[in-house]
């Protein structure tokens, strides 16, 4: 049923898939992207590398290399965001992690080296990339959030220590 519904939306230039939780949805989204559509989706993850891993891990073991290759060939980027209580305690501030689908990033995905994406994000500021910890550090330094909240929302406390 889902693949039939996605077949109908192939007539559109931009496709929004609610959440990619299963192989059928992931496969249909990748096929749409391969045919030139801009496909956007959501996943509940704490970072870009975890997002890539979750997409691949949701697929049958025998299909994971193919999915990894497909994803690497169509990925434009991954944006992770979380809303964090602000320093004043009267609202929230968004912290982000941005991974851009550069040749180096896509090569790491293709080679199953997602654990190295963090270092590519750290060195990729010229193309708009940054890690969540880099953004948390910026928010602390600008007085927008306190250190306690930065540590609570960090996906790698040891790395955050290096930034702060």
Question: What is each stretch, according to the model?
Answer:
Residues 8, 26-27, 163:
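Outer-membrane beta-barrel domain signature
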Residues 1-10:
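Single conserved hydrophobic/aromatic residue that forms the stacking wall/gate
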Residues 8, 33-34, 140:
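Conserved ATPase "switch" residues in P-loop NTPase domains
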Residues 5, 51, 135-136:
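Hydrophobic alpha-helical segments typical of transmembrane helices
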Residues 1, 24, 131:
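Short, conserved clusters of charged catalytic residues that mark active-site
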Residues 5, 28, 150:
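Conserved sugar-transfer catalytic core signal across GT-A, GT-B, and GT-C glycosyltransferases
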Residues 12-83, 113:
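Conserved P-loop NTPase nucleotide-binding/switch module
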Residues 74-164:
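Conserved P-loop NTPase
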């Amino acid at each position: 049923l889902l693949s039939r519904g996605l077949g109908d939306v192939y007539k559109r230039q931009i496709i929004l898939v609610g959440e990619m939780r299963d192989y059928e949805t992931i496969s249909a989204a990748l096929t749409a992207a391969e045919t030139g559509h801009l496909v956007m989706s959501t996943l509940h993850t704490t970072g870009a590398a975890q997002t890539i891993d979750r997409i691949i891990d949701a697929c049958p073991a025998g299909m994971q290399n193919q999915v990894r290759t497909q994803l690497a060939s169509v990925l434009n980027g991954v944006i992770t965001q979380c809303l964090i209580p602000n320093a004043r305690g009267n609202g929230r501030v968004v912290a982000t992690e941005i991974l851009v689908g550069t040749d180096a990033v896509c090569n790491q995905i293709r080679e199953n080296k997602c654990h190295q994406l963090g270092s590519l994000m750290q060195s990729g500021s010229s193309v708009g990339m940054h890690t969540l910890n880099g953004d948390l550090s910026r928010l602390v330094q600008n007085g927008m959030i306190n250190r306690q909240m930065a540590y609570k929302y960090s996906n790698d406390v040891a790395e955050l220590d290096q930034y702060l």
